[in-house]
Amino acid sequence: MRKLLTVSIIVLVALAVLAVPAFAITGNWVKDYEHPYVGLVVYYDANGEFIWRCSGSLISPTKVLTAGHCSDTAEGAVTARVYFQQDAGANYDPATGLDPVSGYPEACAPGTLGTLCATSDELYNYGFANFAGFPNTHDAGLVILDQPISMPVYGVLPEAGALDGLDTARGTKDTIFTVSGYGLSYRTNANSAVPSISYRIRLMATSTLVNLTSKNTDGFNLQTQGNGDDRGGTCSGDSGGPVFLGAPKSNTIVAVTSFGMNSLCRGTDYGYRIDRQEVLDWINSH
């Protein structure tokens, strides 16, 4: 489920200790076949035990862009495995604790290592430390793959300052963003008889701009409309997934899914902006 970090800020990571993880694309979503380079990122501790899962994007054959709180080694992340199947965890069986088709979350299925699945023991966190310095949380991360993955297309980094000016220019509130990830699709109250639902498949949804310069964004975060009224939003497990500038066919990543303000995945969503020169420099340095 989402981890409550303060009274109101909630990270969109899916913890391994829960039978049903907590963050996925919600609301008006569709299956995402447009972005084959978006993967399900599974993290393990020093003992090789599954601790949580996120989403991420290949921006080169070996470099996966995700959130800093996902690749936070200070919180126990040591290694990772990334699955690029659209239905990476669709056949997950709680009784056995794995998906017999993909091997999620324990292994790469035979014949998929280096094609649809890869391992990593090289994780980087831009500086995320439990939201210290908010709103500049430094919530960007990288997973460097042991096996290069060939894709017909990769995620594209933005020009520095790509979002600058959108908050003040006329007509920009209708700017479209597309989110993609493997998180929860429905999140209910913990006391509800209706369970949270996680398909563990790659979904995407579109939304529009809310704010870039509020006290919660201040030039570091991107706030978009959440679930409802023909919109889609993010939830637990979507952390680190791409926020694309434009309609679903866009490959330009301007932010990574970072946090929300509601434990039921309602309300607005926040992504950590990567169109800032210092963030781009850090990404390109690895």
Predicted regions and their residues:
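Conserved catalytic-core segment of clan PA serine endopeptidases
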Residues: 25-33, 48, 77-166, 215
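Chymotrypsin/trypsin-fold serine protease catalytic domain
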Residues: 137-231, 276-280
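Generic short beta-strand segments
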Residues: 42-44, 181-185, 259
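C-terminal subregion of chymotrypsin/trypsin-like serine protease catalytic domains
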Residues: 31-39, 52-103, 107, 198-214, ...
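Short beta-strand segments that buttress and anchor functional surface loops
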Residues: 40-45, 226-227
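C-terminal segment of classical bacterial N-terminal signal peptides
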Residues: 15-22
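Bacterial N-terminal signal peptides that target proteins for export
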Residues: 1-9
